[in-house]
UniProtKB/Swiss-Prot annotation:
SUPFAM superfamilies membership: Pyruvoyl-dependent histidine and arginine decarboxylases
Entry keyword Disulfide bond: no
Protein's name according to its UniProt entry: Histidine decarboxylase proenzyme
Site features described as Cleavage (non-hydrolytic), chain residue numbers: S97, S98
Amino acid sequence: MNKNLEANRNRTLSEGIHKNIKVRAPKIDKTAISPYDRYCDGYGMPGAYGNGYVSVLKVSVGTVKKTDDILLDGIVSYDRAEINDAYVGQINMLTASSFCGVAGQVWGHDLATHDSIAKDEIKPLYELKQFDGTPLKVYDAKPLLEAGIELFGTEKNRRFTTAPGAHVICANKSATAYRPKENRPLKEGEAYGVWSFIALSLSNDRDHCADLFIEDAGLWTKNDNPEDLKKFLEDHRKAVTWSVVECGRDSHVVFERTYIGFAYVIMKPGEIGNALTCAPYVTLARDAVPSEGFPSLNRISLSQWLDDMNFDSLVNPSKK
């Protein structure tokens, strides 16, 4: 692209007195609006407006009491993980591995930025050195997970869910295990708990490189103490982010930051548990787009979006 032309298209927008923000001209159309008023849809489905997509983060768990059909038990526990927290129930989940590319944007970071991110209130959990010596700052993914709940809603308070029966490409993995009812040594495939991770690493050159999703999931077999499992997962974060650095090395991609989060559950005796990590690639419901248009989502915070939608916050009921 002609650099002078691009410079002319770059703009500074006024957000109030002594409050200006710079908006860089996009090189790629990232508009992502579904054909439905109240439903999001899967990326690549017919009828969408724009060439872009939106990545939404979710980690959840679900459990069910074991019956005499372990296959059906696995289906139900997976379904419960889908509907818990941010609601992604009733979808045909297709698997991608696993990037948010140059046409994609992240809900809660790029679009309707979570207030804690917009105000630069979050602090790194730790740092790792990347292949070129650049530090990779690792942040808690809680703001992005909360943003997903605010967009999709919950099972009891649904908002802009994906269309029932929609075909939705997702970065996803899951783990399923049975905790025996009897107090006996565990057999292969049995566990006391299950867990899942999601990590999203943002490239430092997002016009030319993709953001990386890493999903991980597994079984907890040591004991039935949830605090021990939580401690293991807190330590395991560094293994997950090690894989981020190594994938960056493979493609010579340097990341600006990583968001990482996990979910876990200790099953009751006689239960089957599922831990799901997923990031749906969606186009936004028409009514989820402010009246100022899709680009306005790049300029507003999550709380401003909630105000525009006239929603109360689901994760912080005292705030909109």
